């Protein structure tokens, strides 16, 4: 089948059919720079910009700490998988508009047969689609701008920013934290490798120079997808050997979250009772985060790859310029160690929240697990409202927290998904936008009540129906 001469035709037709964007209905407030301030210009930040526009909410800005588009997000930086880990057909940034979907974009450029030929999207194709999405929809991102601190003020939030070394202070009524895995916490490295000197160890999220690992002995600690991706990248870069060390006695292979992927569970999960959500989080943790099959195949095809099961690191030293560790009865030496060990979530440890961190309600403040179900890791996650907003630890202590919406993996326990990943977009982006719309509308209710009870010019006069007005016979006779 011939490819269309205009690959953007369906996307343009989609926008034509849904009609023009609504005008901004949010009244201006003196001293307020932004109605909504989105932190993070990746796939969810761009999606929020479009969703808010379609909701008629103006004065929205999106920032990203990366210096430019090419270094923003994970897909062209520290994401190292060959293909996305989720099925290709999951709804994403298109927000129910087929002409803006990845499938439509891809088929317009490569054909329907090419799309049918794979089950998961190539990482670089996804990055190219997101670039097109931003460009086609005219979504501007302020690159090189970092959020340093949020300061509550009287009826708004004061944002302390760093724009390429220039300090800025801007104001906003609402904030969306669409800033990825580190947005509510940071990289998690086990204590033993974390104690190694700089230059010998890096978290998988770091900008690792894999070319420099050619001919080197590399250790990877961890057994989730990011660990296998790092191992595969090191092997393909020419590492002499790569050994992956897993605490588990077998690699997690059951994607436990998929059993609740049906609409009833997916749509209603945020409203489940706390004990159910807590037990589901524990179930996920016990089952383990699964690498996709191709990530495992990518490494095991190399003869210089070795997998160590039931092998946590309990010691490590530097000897002769090498990292030396004893695992069981064996001693191993490495030139470099990569920790593919995930992230922690704990907003009390984030400098951006230093003005009010103690007031944020966490799961450990909200829910007391039964004996045998305690988990410090999940207890440190924020306990979020249905609009992904922070909640106060004590009622009335910090009411401004409801204006900070968390759209990053810190919402995992509350919403049952790694928030910010593709599976979270269809359900949770509209929920956040609806809550922001409601809050902004009700906060300006006096203005809106005046507007909705105001006068409107008539669309026609009495002459439009005068000829059809029934006139009883006695009325005519009396004339």
Model region roles, listed by residue range:
Residues 93-127:
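A conserved beta-strand/loop capping segment in the N-terminal third of enzymes
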């Amino acid at each position: 089948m011939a490819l269309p001469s205009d690959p953007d035709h369906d996307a343009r037709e989609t926008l034509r059919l849904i009609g023009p964007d609504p005008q901004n209905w949010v009244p201006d407030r003196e001293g307020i720079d932004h109605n909504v301030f989105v932190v993070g210009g990746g796939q969810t930040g761009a999606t929020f910009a479009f969703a808010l526009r379609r909701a008629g909410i103006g004065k929205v800005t999106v920032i990203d700490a990366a210096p430019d588009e090419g270094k923003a997000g994970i897909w062209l930086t520290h994401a190292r998988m060959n293909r996305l880990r989720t099925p290709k057909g999951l709804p994403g940034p298109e927000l129910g508009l087929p002409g803006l979907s990845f499938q439509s974009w891809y088929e317009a450029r490569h054909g329907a047969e090419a799309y049918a030929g794979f089950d998961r999207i190539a990482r670089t194709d996804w990055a190219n689609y997101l670039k097109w999405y931003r460009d086609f929809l005219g979504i501007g991102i302020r690159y090189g701008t970092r959020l340093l601190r949020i300061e509550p003020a009287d009826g708004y939030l004061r944002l302390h920013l760093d724009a390429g070394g220039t300090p800025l202070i801007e104001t906003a009524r609402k904030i969306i934290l669409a800033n990825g895995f580190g947005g509510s916490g940071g990289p998690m490295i086990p204590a033993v490798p974390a104690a190694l000197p700089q230059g010998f160890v890096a978290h998988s999220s770091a900008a690792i120079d894999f070319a420099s690992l050619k001919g080197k002995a590399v250790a990877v600690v961890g057994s989730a997808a990011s660990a296998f991706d790092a191992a595969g990248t090191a092997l393909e870069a020419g590492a002499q050997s790569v050994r992956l060390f897993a605490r588990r006695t077998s690699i997690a292979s059951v994607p436990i979250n998929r059993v609740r992927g049906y609409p009833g569970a997916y749509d209603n999960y945020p409203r489940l009772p706390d004990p159910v959500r807590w037990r589901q989080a524990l179930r996920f943790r016990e089952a383990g985060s699964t690498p996709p099959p191709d990530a495992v195949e990518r490494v095991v095809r190399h003869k210089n790859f070795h997998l160590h099961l039931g092998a946590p690191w309990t010691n490590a030293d530097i000897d002769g310029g090498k990292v030396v560790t004893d695992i069981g009865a064996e001693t191993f030496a490495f030139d470099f160690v990569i920790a593919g060990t995930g992230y922690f979530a704990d907003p009390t440890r984030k400098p951006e929240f230093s003005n009010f961190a103690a007031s944020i309600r966490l799961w450990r403040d909200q829910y007391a697990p039964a004996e045998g179900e305690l988990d410090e890791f999940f207890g440190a996650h924020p306990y979020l409202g249905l609009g992904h907003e922070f909640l106060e630890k004590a009622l009335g202590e910090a009411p401004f927290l409801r204006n900070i919406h968390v759209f990053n993996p810190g919402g995992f326990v509350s919403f049952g998904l790694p928030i910010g990943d593709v599976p979270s977009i269809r359900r949770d982006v509209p929920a956040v936008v609806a809550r922001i719309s409601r809050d902004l509308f009700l906060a300006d209710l006096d203005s809106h009540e005046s507007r909705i009870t105001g006068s409107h010019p008539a669309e026609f006069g009495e002459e439009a129906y005068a000829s059809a007005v029934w006139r009883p016979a006695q009325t005519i006779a009396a004339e």
